[in-house]
């Protein structure tokens, strides 16, 4: 059986609010950790979100 190319990841807020987004990424095309600027509704600002594992 073939291994899945896409992996589920959690994008965790760098502000420490505990807010996160879930998404998928292709681990073959982007082996590095993902960093995206997204909206944090807790502090009502756009901030950096870092990739984390889903447990």
From Swiss-Prot:
Name of the molecule in the record = Large ribosomal subunit protein bL33
Q: Does the keyword NAD apply?
A: no
InterPro entries listed in its UniProt record: Ribosomal_bL33, Ribosomal_bL33_sf, Ribosomal_zn-bd
Source organism (scientific name): Buchnera aphidicola subsp. Acyrthosiphon pisum (strain Tuc7)
- What is the similarity comment for this entry? Belongs to the bacterial ribosomal protein bL33 family.
Q: Which GO terms describe its cellular component?
A: cytosolic large ribosomal subunit
Q: Which superkingdom heads the taxonomic lineage of this protein's source?
A: Bacteria
One of the entry's Gene Ontology molecular-function terms is: structural constituent of ribosome
Task: Write out the entry's keywords from A to Z.
Answer: Ribonucleoprotein, Ribosomal protein
What Pfam families does the record point to? Ribosomal_L33
Disulfide connectivity for this sequence is none
Query: Which GO BP terms apply?
Result: translation
